[in-house]
Amino acid sequence: MERATQPRPRALLLLFLLLGCAAGISAVARARSLLAPTSDTAFGLGAAAAPTSAARVPAVATAEVTVEDAEALPAASGEQESRATESDDDVELRPRGRSLVIISTLDGRIAALDAENHGKKQWDLDVGSGSLVSSSLSKPEVFGNKMIIPSLDGDLFQWDRDRESMEAVPFTVESLLESSYKFGDDVVLVGGKSLTTYGLSAYSGKLRYICSALGCRRWDSDEMEEEEDILLLQRTQKTVRAVGPRSGSEKWNFSVGHFELRYIPDMETRAGFIESTFKLGGNKEDSKIISDVEEQDVDTVIKVSVADWKVMAFSKKGGRLEWEYQFCTPIASAWLVRDGKVIPISLFDDTSYTANEEVLEDEEDIVEAARGATENSVYLGMYRGQLYLQSSVRVSEKFPTRPKALESVNGESAIIPLPTIKWKPLIHSPSRTPVLVGSDEFDKCLSNDKYSHEEYSNGALSILQYPYDNGYYLPYYKRERNKRSTQITVRFLDSPHYSKNIRKKDPILLLHWWKEIFGTILLCIVATTFIVRRLFHPQPHRQRKESETQCQTESKYDSVSADNSDNSWNDIKHSGYVSRYLTDFEPIQCMGRGGFGVVFEAKNKVDDCNYAIKRIRLPNRELAREKVMREVKALAKLEHPGIVRYFNAWLETPPEKWQEEMDEIWLKDESTDWPLSSPSPMDAPSVKIRQMDPFSTKEQIEVIAPSPERSRSFSVGISCGRTSSSESQFSPLEFSGTDCGDNSDSEDAAHNLQDSCLTDCDMEDGTVDGDDEGHSFELCPSEASPYTRSREGTSSSIVFEDSGCDNASSKEDPRMNRLHNGHHYVNKLTEFKHSSSRSSSEATLSTSPTRPTTLSLDFTRNTVDRLQPSSPKVYLYIQMQLCRKENLKDWMNRRCSMEDREHRVCLHIFLQIAEAVQFLHSKGLMHRDLKPSNIFFTMDDVVKVGDFGLVTAMDQDEEEQTVLTPMPAYATHTGQVGTKLYMSPEQIHGNNYSHKVDIFSLGLILFELLYPFSTQMERVRTLTDVRNLKFPPLFTQKYPQEHMMVQDMLSPSPMERPEATDIIENAVFENLEFPGKTVLRQRSRSLSSSGTKHSRQPSSTFSPLPGN
């Protein structure tokens, strides 16, 4: 018995030893599992997913699988480097686990494929949170030609149909929500960002819990093992909705989301893992590359075709397709779970793997090529009729990620260079038709999708209409980025925390634009040279001959030197003088020259009405100035419907030569409104005033018609005088028609025409000749009709029936007086006529410098007087009522037959003129220069008497006889000037005269109204005969009453002429009824608008002048 019981303690000891060994082995295995290498996991965005985390996976015999990932994070790369230093034994002892390919699709589902079992689907789970993308931004009615396309990672892109380019918007969904709740006056933004975490069984796909802002929900199941590995999915969804603030109706919306994956081994929940291990998906600069040690063992590559919705596995060495899986929904993200690590799969790796070793020397180049393809890819796809974008990591890095992109600080702006993606779409396969092998399932997916390609055509781009096109790759070319860089200015918060996210502007290469740059520089040089030459280097003016005159009012034509042409606008601007005329008025155009000044049309800057501004240069003597001012004050008080209204007057004393320089600048700037019309030197007639008996009182006018020969001329001689004095002979005037060759014999060159254009001169026509082409006007006109000139087309029809130019020069230049007296002047005239063939030249009326025309009067000016310093010039500006350019002279020239002139209308016009003259006489004034060219029409066709340059008081003292530079032998009244053809005999003879001189002029105007002329020669002859009371028989027979009245008005004796009141009450006007006759005499100032808006058309009221 003792022997039998002895071995029992030994058996117990052996049993204890066996149990201890088993426990030791179990502890060692447990310790090994705890010492296995691990790494943290961070979440990525879409295709750019997170780095890996290591965990123990049950050892399963499987082939080596690897994924080329150009977008893995650097942290994981560092881990691989550390692991590469491990011993080979440690590498062999590492446990191998199952390989799963986790796929996230746009419909919100998660699927797992078994990489070792030919891609068989391990599990498929719908978490019930809806699709990842939903938007109404692609509809054309939202943004028109431009639209906003969201990206799955939260970036926004703007598509421009016109430019066919896509640009990144400088803010994300988060910054759009955080910047302001109000997007515009009619849009309010609402929405937010939601984070949801899902816990899944790694290999069964069963949902264990869901955690969100509302709390966590768990599914307890006995089937779930405690040690089963967990896949941690985190879904980020961002939603923005735009609603109307009043109605609450939704205008547009979009929502984008993405999944992030992490692998949790065993039961370790690691409290606080979100703070310690999760990284922002926006950190896109990390990447992971498999170490060289592992690359020696791998032989399979997992690739994702975004366009075909496929996941494929290739043999790395042979490039053979091992397996593929077709999804029915676009793929958003993909991961490979192997050996306890999560490796993101690039969706944009389009590298071809082939067995050809010559193409790429080693496997390292393959990785670099895959990385290059990944960098420059953007995919534009469509899901359920909604466009969306998937961008690679390298392209996404170039997009701004500031959350406060729309906010501003201190009004400062920051410039962000945004990448522009050109519309150069690349289809995903060389052939637009799908490959036959394996395409049946894909066709089935298309047929089952209710959002077919007919629905896709409703999208904004209308590009995905081919049945097998689901999207396009948009390469991001570096050379295009270097050529052009789109810059969008946005405002940022001045925070140093964000300074590291700003990318510097890429260098712009200008070599591609060398032609445009060269052309722009050349154009700038030419334009600058032209402007400088025109403004600062004007052409030198031609100087006027000393013996030459052109209706000059002021002594403006002094010696003109080349230095004057160098004066620029800067000299005038810096002179310090401010003109009231230029301050209060805006000049429009020059309307012409009156008896004493220049008339401008100008617009008042305050009331916006147009007025006629007359500029008169006052005489140098104080007595003369007082007289002119007294006359202006008297005229300003005249208020009558038949008189041009005066509104305002002021004096200006500009610096020396300031006004001349301003006039020259006006000429250059307003050249279209200042053309000159003149007879051609070949066609210009000559007007010869022959020397007659100085004691003869008979007026003689001889008209010689121009001959067709080259040198043709006609002469008009007007000789008049007084029996009491031989010094009163009328000034002779001679014009000679010569060619341009005769002009070369002249001693002096012709003066610049432009310089004379703004001279205050005494011309017979005070208005611009409206019938001449280009609104031209005459510098030294006659009574020749502008209508006739335009009708005949030549200047040979111009007739100078008076010597207005002579008088104009005489009345304005006192130095001429010494040369106009007695026989001295007759002797000078004789010498002039003997040498006329040598020294005569044509009037400078043409703008052509090669055919000058000069008005030759052999009046020598004293050089000493010319060099004497002149006193400051004083100008009187008078603001008057603006009338039409057409005066009574133009009105009659357009009606050359009696049928064209209605008798009633002519009498109506004359009656209005007579009433205006009667009003003047009642105020103790006389006009002294009544003629058709001084009778105007307002915009509403009311007759107005104007041009009161020669108006004077009827009781003027004799000592004031020369205050306005009278002619040499005339001893009464201002200047003794006026148009000779309409002057009374006492004016021409230089005798004392009264207001009856206006009655004489009225008689000639009435005769000319009732008796039209076909030619100007006929007009000159007939009016000359009528002045001597020789009336045409037709006029006597047809108008007997008018004949008697005209005969009385033209009586040689002023005492026998009727008063203006008697004329108005004549029986001729009592037998006829005029439209508005009674209204005319009671017409107030309001019936004729004082100022008129800028309009050249007559009013629509009743016009007493038919055919105007």
Curated annotation (Swiss-Prot):
Its main location: endoplasmic reticulum. Inhibited by HSPA5/BIP in absence of stress. Perturbation in protein folding in the endoplasmic reticulum (ER) promotes reversible dissociation from HSPA5/BIP and oligomerization, resulting in trans-autophosphorylation and kinase activity induction. Inactivated following phosphorylation at Thr-794 by AKT (AKT1, AKT2 and/or AKT3). Inhibited by ATAD3A at mitochondria-endoplasmic reticulum contact sites, providing a safe haven for mitochondrial protein translation during ER stress. Induction: By ER stress. Residues 1-27 form the signal peptide. SMART domains: S_TKc (SM00220). The modification Phosphoserine is found at residues 707, 1086. It holds the Pfam family Pkinase. CDD domains: Luminal_EIF2AK3, STKc_EIF2AK3_PERK. InterPro entries: CC_SR_Kinase, Kinase-like_dom_sf, Prot_kinase_dom, Quinoprotein_ADH-like_sf, Ser/Thr_kinase_AS, WD40/YVTN_repeat-like_dom_sf. It is found in: Endoplasmic reticulum membrane. It is a single-pass type I membrane protein. Residues 528-1108 are cytoplasmic. Residues 28-506 are lumenal. The chain crosses the membrane at residues 507-527. Its EC number is 2.7.11.1, 2.7.10.2. The active site is at residue 929. The modification Phosphothreonine is found at residues 794, 974. One of its GO terms (biological process) is PERK-mediated unfolded protein response. ATP binds at residues 591-599, 614. Ubiquitous. Oligomerization of the N-terminal ER luminal domain by ER stress promotes EIF2AK3/PERK trans-autophosphorylation of the C-terminal cytoplasmic kinase domain at multiple residues including Thr-974 on the kinase activation loop. Autophosphorylated at Tyr-611 following endoplasmic reticulum stress, leading to activate its activity. Dephosphorylated at Tyr-611 by PTPN1/PTP1B, leading to inactivate its enzyme activity. Phosphorylation at Thr-794 by AKT (AKT1, AKT2 and/or AKT3) inactivates EIF2AK3/PERK. The lumenal domain senses perturbations in protein folding in the ER, probably through reversible interaction with HSPA5/BIP. Belongs to the protein kinase superfamily. Ser/Thr protein kinase family. GCN2 subfamily. Forms dimers with HSPA5/BIP in resting cells. Homotetramerizes in response to endoplasmic reticulum (ER) stress, leading to its activation. Interacts with HSP90B1/GRP94. Interacts with DNAJC3; inhibiting EIF2AK3/PERK activity. Interacts with ATAD3A; ATAD3A and EIF2S1/eIF-2-alpha occupy a common binding site within the cytoplasmic loop of EIF2AK3/PERK, leading to prevent EIF2AK3/PERK association with its substrate EIF2S1/eIF-2-alpha. Interacts with MFN2. Interacts with TMEM33. Interacts with PDIA6. Interacts with LACC1. This is Eukaryotic translation initiation factor 2-alpha kinase 3. The gene is Eif2ak3.
